[in-house]
């Protein structure tokens, strides 16, 4: 009988948006499955690359879907190669940018990299860490300055010779900027080549990336072929939409859930994710079986929020957050009518947080409101308010939301 056609394990294919090599997706699936089988036969783990440029200081759940897939490879017995782009971060990835990025200093990049590793779980037990830092042979942390900083001019010119201007202008971001007359600095053309060379340097078998990284991941394959290093597979994952359910999760859009948020804040935010986005959140952020979850969107939200919060803080903290959130906003919303209402009719907008608490009668004065907020007693929809000067623009922004002071004082805001 002929050999059965290999297929990808569920942990690998879950949430996958695209897989290189290009062409018939089933062919790519079978090719990667065959490479997995061959690696197992040889007793050799695959080397799975994920590169991150430490251009900021915080990781949110939108970033975490790539790290979750990298962790899945680790748990499957393979080697995660986490590349800290300490060199490329000084150039800045032009992907998705309409203008040249501001270049960062070595000191800024080093500080951000240290923060990233801490958030990924460098000092945490592997049960709640995004990556497994404990099991020998499961993780390599590499800095691309190792091989890029020492490149001499002939090597750089040689690298530039592997690409063309036409190839670079085919990249959507460059094409738009060129068409609109927005300047493109020459060093920006280097970025995809440098990121691609990372795959050569670490002998990657698989590279992970978001769907917005397709050009850069393909460049890695091209450079591996050029340097006779084999060819990596590119496994692309979707871009997670933010809490608004519309735009991608982004700190600048204010629709994020940070990895380091406290359990109650994390759970409360996730419990309000829009119906259209719930299935993606379940698939990309949890190991829950979507088919076994209730059809009721509200129950599905709660299951997802509990699972995500538990993955970061442990099940006991997550269950407590779920219980506390139910107390704050009446659980599923059915008991929400028991929360006293407070009118926004007399509130002058834009309104700062300290003024809002006093204007609706939760605090006796603005000074008391400032003190309570600074003391950590104030929340809106379960999310802690830490800045007394946080500004709210209109009554519509607050309509129907629950304002809380301490453990016993709640007001549902009505316009």
Swiss-Prot record:
GO cellular component: cytosol
Function: Catalyzes the attachment of tyrosine to tRNA(Tyr) in a two-step reaction: tyrosine is first activated by ATP to form Tyr-AMP and then transferred to the acceptor end of tRNA(Tyr).
HAMAP family assigned: Tyr_tRNA_synth_type2
SUPFAM superfamilies (alphabetical): Alpha-L RNA-binding motif, Nucleotidylyl transferase
Class of the enzyme per the UniProt entry, highest EC level: ligase
Location of the motif 'HIGH' region: 54-63
Primary location recorded for the protein, binned into one broad class: cytoplasm
Keyword Aminoacyl-tRNA synthetase in record: yes
Amino acids binding ATP: 251
GO biological process: tyrosyl-tRNA aminoacylation
Keywords carried by this UniProt record: Aminoacyl-tRNA synthetase, ATP-binding, Cytoplasm, Ligase, Nucleotide-binding, Protein biosynthesis, RNA-binding
NCBIfam families associated with the record: tyrS (TIGR00234)
GO molecular function: ATP binding; RNA binding; tyrosine-tRNA ligase activity
EC numbers: 6.1.1.1
Motif mapping: 'KMSKS' region: 248-252
Full protein name: Tyrosine--tRNA ligase
Residue ranges of domain S4 RNA-binding in the record: 351-414
InterPro entries named in the record: aa-tRNA-synth_Ic, Rossmann-like_a/b/a_fold, S4_RNA-bd_sf, SYY-like_C, Tyr-tRNA-ligase, Tyr-tRNA-ligase_bac-type, Tyr-tRNA-ligase_bac_2
Organism annotation: Synechococcus sp. (strain CC9605)
Substrates-to-products reaction catalysed: tRNA(Tyr) + L-tyrosine + ATP = L-tyrosyl-tRNA(Tyr) + AMP + diphosphate + H(+)
Entries under Pfam families matching the protein: SYY_C-terminal, tRNA-synt_1b
Superkingdom of the organism of origin: Bacteria
Family: Belongs to the class-I aminoacyl-tRNA synthetase family. TyrS type 2 subfamily.
């Amino acid at each position: 009988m002929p050999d059965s056609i290999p297929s990808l394990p569920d942990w690998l294919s879950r949430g996958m948006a695209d897989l290189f090599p290009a062409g018939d997706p089933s062919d790519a699936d079978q090719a990667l499955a065959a490479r997995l089988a061959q690696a197992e036969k040889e007793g050799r783990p695959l080397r799975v690359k994920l590169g991150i440029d430490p251009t900021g200081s915080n990781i949110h759940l939108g970033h975490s879907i790539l790290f979750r897939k990298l962790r899945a490879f680790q748990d499957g017995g393979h080697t995660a190669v986490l590349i800290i782009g300490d060199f490329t971060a000084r150039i800045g990835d032009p992907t998705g940018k309409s203008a040249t990025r501001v270049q960062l200093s070595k000191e800024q990049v080093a500080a951000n990299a240290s923060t990233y590793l801490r958030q990924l779980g460098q000092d945490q037990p592997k049960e709640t860490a995004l990556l497994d830092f404990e099991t020998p042979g499961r993780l390599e942390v590499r800095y691309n300055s190792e091989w890029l900083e020492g490149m001499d001019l002939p090597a750089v010119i040689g690298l530039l010779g592997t690409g063309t201007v036409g190839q670079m202008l085919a990249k959507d971001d460059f094409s738009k900027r060129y068409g609109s007359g927005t300047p493109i600095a020459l060093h920006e053309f280097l970025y995809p080549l440098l990121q691609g060379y990372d795959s050569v340097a670490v002998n990657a078998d698989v590279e992970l990336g978001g769907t917005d990284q397709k050009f850069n991941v393909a460049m890695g394959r091209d450079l591996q072929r050029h340097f006779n290093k084999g060819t990596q597979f590119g496994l692309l994952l979707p871009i997670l939409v933010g809490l608004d359910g519309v735009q991608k999760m982004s700190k600048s859009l204010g629709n994020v859930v940070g990895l380091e948020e406290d359990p109650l804040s994390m759970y409360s935010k996730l419990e309000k994710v829009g119906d259209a986005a719930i299935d993606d959140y379940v698939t990309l952020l949890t190991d829950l079986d979507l088919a076994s979850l209730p059809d009721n969107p509200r129950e599905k939200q709660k299951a997802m929020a509990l699972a995500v919060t538990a993955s970061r803080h442990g099940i006991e903290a997550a269950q407590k957050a779920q219980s506390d959130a139910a107390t704050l906003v009446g659980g599923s919303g059915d008991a929400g009518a028991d929360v006293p209402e407070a009118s926004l009719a007399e509130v002058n907008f834009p309104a700062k947080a300290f003024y809002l608490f006093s204007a609706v009668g939760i605090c006796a004065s603005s000074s008391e409101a400032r003190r309570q907020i600074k003391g950590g007693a104030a929340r809106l929809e379960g999310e802690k308010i830490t800045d007394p000067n946080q500004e709210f623009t209109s009554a519509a922004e607050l309509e129907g939301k629950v304002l809380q002071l301490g453990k016993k004082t709640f007001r549902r805001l009505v316009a």
